[in-house]
Structures are given as structure tokens and as C-alpha cells.
């Protein structure tokens, strides 16, 4: 009997959220979208068994890979074809300083089939380094991509949406079914491109205040904002910045979230 948890001699580890990509059409589509170039500083998060690593290395001379699984990191270091091209960082991507890989005049580009159990906190970690990054291509749960790309007035719109769109343009690339992985996940997946803005459309004076407004707002998303935000701004003050206090957090645009955060920053 074939064990679907074993692929290319490696047993998928549940605690690392491992699902290995093996469908060639999907692999080719992702690498084509990434379009690696020699001058790029390319970084792969969670290379696993090398499904994306190998075709990317066909197009560039050096690739940084960040892999937490000791066995997989060892396989990559000893890979007969790739070992001279790979710089293996055996590390937790959640704690990794991606900005240290940035080089003047060379685009820092990050990609990966992210473990679904850490994808949201990892995206928040990377957003903090966004000024160093040119773009990111990630395989994620389809529902996470829908949240990243959502607009106001939808159930998918939330804190992750607002904070990601504050830092990045969000562009869904392709949808991927469970058949493309071993073991097959119980959910559909999708690839998304996150491209940090060269000049943000709206600038928060204090990012911690924007985070607070999002956290408090979406923590009580069904309440009107006159109630949700009453600890720091009144209904009258909301009207002064042209925001209807009877709206709910899920009705607010990114620009309105930034306006409320900037009001908070300047009225302490």
C-alpha cells in the first residue's frame, strides 16, 4: 500500500505543515510567474524536496533557502546538482532576518510553498521587512489569498487584508487543487504575488496605531465604529474626518483606516 505521507523518501511532518508540491504544470506555472533573473537576490522559504528549487536554480547561479526541517536542509546541502548553487539557512523563517540578505542595486525576491499553519504570522513578519523586498510569490490556502485580496464590505475583509494592502499590491496568480501535493491537503490552494509599494498610497504616521485600529476594529467587526473605537475617538470626531460613525469596520476602506490611525497619533 502506498503511503501518501512519504514523497521521494521523505515522510511529511505534520508539525511543520508539510505538503510537497509535485504537479509539473503547477510548478512550471509558478516558476514562469516568478521569472527569476541573474541579478536578483532570490530566497525560497521552505524548499522542502526542491520542487520549485530545481527549476529556479536552472535560471540563476545562487539561491538562498530557509528550511527548518534538519533532514531536508541536509538533503539540500548534499544535493548532487544543486549544492553549489544553494546557500542553505537552517532556520525558522518566523525569526529569520530577511533584510540581512538585501544588497544595494539587487532586487530581493522571496518565494515559497508556505506551511499553512504559519502562513499568516509569517506574512506579518515579512511585511515588517517590506522596504527591503521587491516582491514575494507564495503558495497559500485559497481562503488566505481571498482574504489578502478582499475589498471592503466582504466577509473575507479583515486585519490581514488591511495591513497587507497597506504595505503591498496584492495580485492572485493561480489556483491549485489538492491533487498537486503529497500528501494532498484538505483545502484548495492559490499562488499570490505581493509587491511592496514603491510609494504607499496612504502613509500612517505611526504603524502601531494602524495595527491597533485594525485589531480593535476587526475584533468587533459587527459593531458600528462609533462603539468599536469609542475608547479613543467620538462619533463627532469621526464625522470631522469625513467618516460615517454608523459604518462597521468591514465597511471602511484602507484610506479610512489610515485616517483614523493618523487622528489617533495626532490627538494623544
From Swiss-Prot:
Provide the Gene Ontology terms for cellular component: cytosol
UniProt keyword Cytoplasm present: yes
Question: GO molecular function of the protein, one example?
Answer: 16S rRNA (adenine(1518)-N(6)/adenine(1519)-N(6))-dimethyltransferase activity
The UniProt function text for this chain reads: Specifically dimethylates two adjacent adenosines (A1518 and A1519) in the loop of a conserved hairpin near the 3'-end of 16S rRNA in the 30S particle. May play a critical role in biogenesis of 30S subunits.
Per UniProt, the enzyme's principal EC class comes to transferase
Task: Tell me which UniProt keywords the record has, alphabetically.
Answer: Cytoplasm, Methyltransferase, RNA-binding, rRNA processing, S-adenosyl-L-methionine, Transferase
Q: Which Pfam families match?
A: RrnaAD
Tell me the protein's name.
Ribosomal RNA small subunit methyltransferase A
The species this protein was found in: Tolumonas auensis (strain DSM 9187 / NBRC 110442 / TA 4)
- The transmembrane segments are none
UniProt family annotation: Belongs to the class I-like SAM-binding methyltransferase superfamily. rRNA adenine N(6)-methyltransferase family. RsmA subfamily.
Q: What is its EC number?
A: 2.1.1.182
Among its keywords, does the record have DNA damage? no
Residues that hold S-adenosyl-L-methionine according to the record: 19, 21, 46, 67, 92, 113
Q: What is its main location?
A: cytoplasm
Catalytic activity reads: adenosine(1518)/adenosine(1519) in 16S rRNA + 4 S-adenosyl-L-methionine = N(6)-dimethyladenosine(1518)/N(6)-dimethyladenosine(1519) in 16S rRNA + 4 S-adenosyl-L-homocysteine + 4 H(+)
Subcellular localization, as worded in the UniProt entry: Cytoplasm
Amino acid at each position: 500500500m502506498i503511503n501518501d505521507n512519504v514523497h521521494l523518501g521523505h515522510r511529511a511532518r505534520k508539525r511543520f505543515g508539510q505538503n510537497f508540491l509535485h504537479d509539473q504544470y503547477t510548478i512550471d506555472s509558478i516558476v514562469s510567474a516568478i521569472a527569476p533573473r541573474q541579478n536578483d537576490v532570490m530566497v525560497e522559504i521552505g524548499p522542502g524536496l526542491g520542487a520549485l528549487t530545481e527549476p529556479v536554480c536552472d535560471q540563476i547561479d545562487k539561491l538562498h533557502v530557509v528550511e527548518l526541517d534538519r533532514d531536508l536542509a541536509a538533503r539540500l546541502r548534499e544535493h548532487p546538482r544543486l549544492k553549489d548553487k544553494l546557500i542553505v539557512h537552517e532556520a525558522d523563517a518566523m525569526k529569520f532576518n530577511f533584510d540581512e540578505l538585501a544588497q544595494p542595486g539587487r532586487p530581493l525576491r522571496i518565494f515559497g510553498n508556505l506551511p499553512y499553519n504559519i502562513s499568516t504570522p509569517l506574512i506579518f513578519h515579512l511585511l515588517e521587512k517590506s522596504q527591503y523586498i521587491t516582491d514575494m510569490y507564495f503558495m497559500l490556502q485559497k481562503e488566505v489569498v481571498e482574504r489578502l485580496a478582499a475589498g471592503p464590505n466582504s466577509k473575507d475583509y479583515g486585519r490581514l487584508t488591511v495591513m497587507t494592502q497597506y504595505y503591498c499590491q496584492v495580485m492572485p496568480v493561480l489556483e491549485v487543487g489538492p491533487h498537486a501535493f503529497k500528501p494532498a491537503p484538505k483545502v484548495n490552494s492559490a499562488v499570490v504575488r505581493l509587491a511592496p509599494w514603491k510609494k504607499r498610497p496612504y502613509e500612517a504616521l505611526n504603524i502601531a496605531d494602524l495595527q491597533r485600529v485594525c485589531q480593535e476594529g476587526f475584533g468587533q467587526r459587527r459593531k458600528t465604529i462609533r462603539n468599536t473605537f469609542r475608547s479613543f475617538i467620538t462619533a463627532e470626531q469621526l464625522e470631522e474626518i469625513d467618516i460615517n460613525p454608523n459604518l462597521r469596520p468591514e465597511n471602511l476602506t484602507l484610506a479610512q483606516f489610515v485616517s483614523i490611525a493618523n487622528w489617533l497619533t495626532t490627538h494623544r
